[in-house]
C-alpha cells in the first residue's frame, strides 16, 4: 500500500491571473481582520487580568502559555511552519500579558547575551528585560521584588551544569517557576569584518570551550582571553579592531559588528537549559517536572536506597547531579529532576519516604516541562 499522507493539501484560492496590486489589496484586507481579532483577543486578556488581580492570582502562568503554544502550532496546515506559528503567538501572548500587568524579568549578562536571547524567546518583546552583572544578582532582584521573575542558565548539553546556579538554588528562598531551552549558535564577530585583523579572541569560558576545535583550526596563533560573558566580549570587539568576539548573532546589531564566521560551535546539537525563578511555585499543568536537593550520610549503597521511593511510585527521574558540600570535604548534595508535580499524591509520598533518611532535603520547585 503506498505511503499516502493524511494531511490535507493546502492550495491557494487566489487566481494566478491576479496582479500584484490586486493580491496586495487582499493582503491588506486580511491584515485589517487580523488586527481587529488581535484587539478582540487583547480585550479578553485584559478582562482575565482584572479577574486575576481581584483574586491575587499570578499573571504569568507558564503552563497555560505552553498549552496555547502547543495548540496553535498544531492548528496550522501550512504554508507557515509550526515553529513560525509558535514564534508569532509568543509575541501575541507577550503583548496580551503586558495588558494584564507589566512583567519585569531579570537576566544574567548584558544585552545580546544568550540568557538575554532566552528571556526574549520565553517572555517576548513586551516584557521589560533587566540585565544583571551576575547570576547572584538575578536572584537578588527577584527576592527584593525589583523583578517579577529571573532567568538563569542551569546546564549546557556539551559543557554540563552551571554549578553557581545550583549553589544559589540551595541558598535562596526562590522557587523554580519554569524552564526554557535555547539552541546555541556561536559566531565570530569583529568590528572591521576582516579575519586578518584579529589577534585576540575573547569570550565566556564556556563559549570558548564549545568552539575549541574551530579556534585551533583557524586561529592557532591567536591570544585567547576569557571574559565574564559573550556580550562583554562583543563590547570589547566593538572598540578594538584586533579583537574577535565569540558571541550571539544578536550582538552583531547591538554592538555594530560584522560576522566573520557563523555557527562555529564544535557540536551542532548545542542546547542550553535555563531556569525561571520566582517567589511562588507554579501551579500544576499536567506535564510537570520537580527539582529537589538532598544530602545523606556517606554509606555503601546509600544513593541506590534513596532512589527506591521514586521507583516504587513509578516516577521517572530525568536528571541526577552531585555537588560537594561547602566546608565538608568528601560529602555531597544530590540534585534530582523528575517528572511530576509536588502537589501530586504519589510525588508527595515519594518525597516523604526520601526525607526519612536525609540529613537535608529541599524542594526547589515544580514547574511545566519546557518546550
Could you describe each region identified by the protein language model?
Residues 1-371:
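Domain-level signature for soluble enzymes in the chorismate/prephenate branch of the shikimate pathway
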Amino acid at each position: 500500500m503506498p505511503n499516502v499522507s493524511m494531511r490535507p493539501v493546502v492550495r491557494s484560492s487566489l487566481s494566478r491571473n491576479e496582479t500584484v496590486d490586486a493580491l496586495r489589496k487582499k493582503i491588506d484586507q486580511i491584515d485589517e481582520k487580523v488586527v481587529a481579532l488581535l484587539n478582540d483577543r487583547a480585550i479578553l486578556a485584559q478582562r482575565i487580568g482584572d479577574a486575576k488581580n481581584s483574586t491575587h492570582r499570578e499573571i504569568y502562568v507558564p503552563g497555560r502559555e505552553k498549552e496555547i503554544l502547543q495548540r496553535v502550532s498544531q492548528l496550522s496546515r501550512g504554508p507557515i511552519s509550526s515553529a513560525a506559528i509558535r514564534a508569532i503567538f509568543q509575541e501575541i501572548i507577550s503583548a496580551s500579558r503586558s495588558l494584564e500587568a507589566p512583567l519585569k524579568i531579570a537576566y544574567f549578562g548584558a544585552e545580546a547575551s544568550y540568557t538575554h536571547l532566552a528571556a526574549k524567546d520565553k517572555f517576548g518583546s513586551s516584557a521589560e528585560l533587566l540585565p544583571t552583572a551576575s547570576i547572584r544578582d538575578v536572584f537578588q532582584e527577584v527576592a527584593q521584588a525589583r523583578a517579577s521573575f529571573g532567568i538563569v542558565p542551569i546546564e549546557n548539553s556539551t559543557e554540563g551544569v552551571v554549578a553557581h546556579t545550583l549553589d544559589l538554588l540551595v541558598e535562596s528562598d526562590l522557587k523554580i517557576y519554569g524552564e526554557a531551552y535555547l539552541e546555541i549558535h556561536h559566531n565570530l564577530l569583529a568590528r572591521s569584518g576582516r579575519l586578518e585583523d584579529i589577534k585576540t579572541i575573547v569570550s565566556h569560558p564556556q563559549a570558548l570551550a564549545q568552539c575549541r576545535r574551530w579556534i585551533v583550526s583557524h586561529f592557532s596563533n591567536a591570544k585567547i582571553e576569557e571574559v565574564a560573558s559573550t556580550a562583554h566580549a562583543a563590547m570589547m570587539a566593538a572598540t578594538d579592531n584586533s579583537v574577535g568576539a565569540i558571541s550571539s548573532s544578536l550582538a552583531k546589531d547591538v554592538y555594530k559588528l560584522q560576522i566573520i564566521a557563523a555557527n562555529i560551535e564544535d557540536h551542532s546539537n548545542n542546547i542550553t537549559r535555563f531556569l525561571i525563578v520566582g517567589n511562588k511555585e507554579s501551579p500544576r499543568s499536567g506535564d510537570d517536572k520537580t527539582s529537589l536537593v538532598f544530602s545523606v550520610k556517606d554509606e555503601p549503597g546509600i544513593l541506590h536506597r534513596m532512589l527506591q521511593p521514586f521507583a516504587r511510585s513509578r516516577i521517572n527521574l530525568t536528571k541526577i547531579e552531585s555537588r560537594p558540600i561547602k566546608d565538608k570535604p568528601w560529602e555531597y548534595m544530590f540534585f534530582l529532576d523528575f517528572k511530576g508535580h509536588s502537589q501530586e499524591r504519589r510525588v508527595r509520598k515519594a518525597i516523604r519516604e526520601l526525607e526519612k533518611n536525609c540529613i537535608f532535603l529541599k524542594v526547589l520547585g515544580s514547574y511545566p516541562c519546557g518546550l
